[in-house]
Amino acid sequence: MSYADQVFIQNCKEILAHGTWDTALPVRPRWEDGESAHTVKRFGLVNRYDLRREFPVQTIRKMAFRSAVDELLWIWQKKSSNIGDLHSHIWDAWADETGSIGKAYGYQLGVKHRYREGWFDQVDRVLYDLRYDPASRRILTSLYNHHDLHEMHLYPCAWSVTFNVTGNVLNAVLNQRSQDMLTANGWNVMQYAVLLHMFAAVSDLVPGELVHVIADAHIYDRHVPIVEEIISREPYPAPTLWMDPAAEDFYSFTPDSFRLEGYRAWPLERKIPVAV
């Protein structure tokens, strides 16, 4: 049984059984028909994934692994906020007529900042510190720039990553202010597990723990029947992540640099409505 499945099932059961509904409150998200998209939530979920044991991917529903990696590279490698650089349509609802999602996600990672050692963007600063100052407790990124929030078409959900080197092991804490459990949980866990593998590989480190901290873990009202169906399934064993050993530079990775070997998963036959 995949450990990612165990975590997801446990989280969803906890939310459905003991969560709090926001139906009495005004909410921002809307369904395609204009109706308010309400949620049931739990506050402060913390999940730990040891990447030395297995790669965390759900099998109780088939995950679009390649698309998830493509979006990860769009943000962290291309540092783009234009959907023209993305090979999927997951951001179309938040893009303007030019294809931009504003000063969000990749834009923030690409802004150069002045440090004592010189000018770096946030990704290059992480790479620098992992190589030259791995004992630092200051290796982190943040996408939640209050100065630019008014120019973001969607505020960052997964907004901060703190990296920590323990011996020769690279660990990371992913902070997420908001998590749509059905559409995004398995997706984000896969992505940041891949990201941890990438940083570890180019820094001569071993990928260790990914700790996922979710402030508001929620299930939308119209997602409840789909979630109940998915978590009733019998999980398959976790697949193995293959990563191209020839990719020795962070910026040389492509979607073809990764694949899941031995991945068996249940098909997702129901269309998932997305609240915007």
Predicted ranges, named:
Residues 1-276:
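Terminal, non-catalytic protein-protein interaction segments that mediate quaternary/complex assembly
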